[in-house]
Curated annotation (Swiss-Prot):
Protein's name according to its UniProt entry: Probable pectate lyase C
GO-annotated biological processes: cell wall organization; polysaccharide catabolic process
Gene transcribed to yield this protein: plyC
Cofactor list: Ca(2+)
Entry's localization field: Secreted
EC identifiers of the protein: 4.2.2.2
């Protein structure tokens, strides 16, 4: 068990605390998602597809905080449909954590979802024409350190009337051919994409329409479409790095038009596939950004607290993104591709072409006498009672429940925690 960080370290850094963050380090449009705070704790106790103690059962009801007493691969046949106000804390799983394999997830209308440190691997056996993760409606959601791969349609898509969504520190990878798309980000309700890795998707890395902020992302080895920009939009892009790979056939930004209004700053493109990170800044001109209408003034969107240089973003992303508390073989191989700087990478049509989902160490189930989701030894450190189910009580010094205090302590706060105000 990792030692608990001090409670002071869990406080949001350098920003107003009038609205509680989903967790320390949450940023962007979805930063204040509530999740299941105030609801019940559900402990996932097995790796079954359904039934009592399963993840499917855990997310089937509203107002729940989901933690894990097991680690490993959960094989699912049908899509997982997540209810409103659910927190999924994958970092609480023992061993190598949790991978959900075999089909995708729907977060449509899953208002206030908080999802952290989990792997969603759809695969060839998933529903044809469906995404790894879909959000078509709903508001106030944040996805942090999530690894999503092998979508049959898109890998991670946000569209329709969805609003106030953040995807941060995550991997969106290897949409399966013949479609092979990173995903749509098409909503006027606001999407923040901060410090993510898009890799081995032929197109839509991502496809943006509407209100969007795209900051410190790395896009690697796209095929015929890097950053798609289309339609009536107001977006901005800061400090991203596009790195061509063996499959890349077009420049970084494509398909823009005069209805796409964008503020751009310090975005880099490395086209030469020579094994060295040596790209250059894309000049601020419409021709470098797919024909978009370049604007001179930043939009007043909820920005990343710190904006890295593109080189810093590559270092951060390769070290930290995805379900990185324990990186599985899939994510490790993807990161190795990025670090080849153009010489390795491929578009795939079947996950078996990349070695499949692999195995995970399930770890040991911790003792939790009162069944409230917090192991007994941690309750002793926190000062709570291991014999009384008190994990949903609020710690007055942070505003989070004791369960959240513990879960937050298991993982780094993110890039902002390493910086000074």
């Amino acid at each position: 068990m990792q030692p608990l960080h001090t409670l002071l370290a869990l406080l949001p850094l350098c920003r107003s605390t009038t609205a509680l963050l989903a967790f320390p380090g949450a940023e962007g449009f979805g930063a204040n998602a509530v999740g299941g705070r105030g609801g019940d704790v559900y402990v996932v106790t097995n790796l079954e597809d359904s039934g009592e103690g399963s993840l499917r059962d855990a997310v089937s009801e509203t107002d729940r905080i989901v933690v894990f007493a097991v680690g490993g691969v959960i094989n699912i046949e049908d899509r997982l449909v997540v209810s409103k106000r659910v927190t999924i804390l994958g970092q609480t799983a023992p061993g190598d954590g949790i991978t959900v394999y075999g089909n995708g997830w729907s977060f449509s209308n899953a208002d206030d979802a908080i999802v952290r440190y989990i792997r969603v691997r759809m695969g060839r056996g998933g529903d044809s024409g469906k995404d790894g993760i879909t959000i078509a409606e709903g508001s106030n959601m944040i996805f942090d350190h999530v690894s999503v791969s092998w979508g049959r349609d898109e890998t991670f898509s946000i569209s329709g009337t969805a609003e106030n969504i953040t995807v941060q520190d995550s991997i969106i990878a290897q949409g399966l051919e013949t479609h092979s798309c990173g995903g749509l980000m098409q909503t006027d309700g606001g999407v923040s994409l901060f410090r993510n890795l898009y890799i081995d998707n032929k197109t839509r890395n991502p496809k943006v329409k509407g209100v969007n902020e795209f900051t410190n992302n790395v896009v690697y080895n796209w095929g015929g479409g890097g950053g798609y920009i289309a339609g009536d939009s107001s977006g901005q892009s800061f400090g991203n790095y596009f790195i061509s790979g063996p499959s890349t056939s077009v420049t970084a930004f494509t398909r823009g038009n005069e209805n796409f209004h964008g503020y751009v700053e310090n975005n880099y493109y490395d086209p030469d596939q020579d094994g060295t990170l040596n790209g250059n800044e894309l000049g601020v001109s419409s021709s470098n950004y797919g024909g978009m209408d370049i604007v001179d003034t930043k939009y007043d969107y909820p920005a990343a607290q710190y904006i890295m240089t593109p080189d810093e973003a590559v270092s951060y992303v390769t070290e930290n993104v995805g379900a990185s508390l324990v990186r599985d073989g899939v994510d490790s191989n993807l990161i190795d591709q990025v670090l080849s700087y153009g010489t390795d990478g491929a578009l795939i049509s079947d996950e078996d072409d990349f070695g499949g989902v692999g195995d995970l160490d399930g770890g040991e189930t911790p003792t939790d006498t009162d069944g409230d989701g917090i192991p007994d030894d941690v309750e002793t450190q926190l000062g709570t009672d291991p014999n009384i189910a008190d994990s949903t009580e609020i710690d007055s010094s942070t505003g989070y429940s004791w369960l959240e205090v513990w879960a937050n302590s298991l993982v780094p706060e993110g890039y902002a925690s390493t910086r000074k105000c």
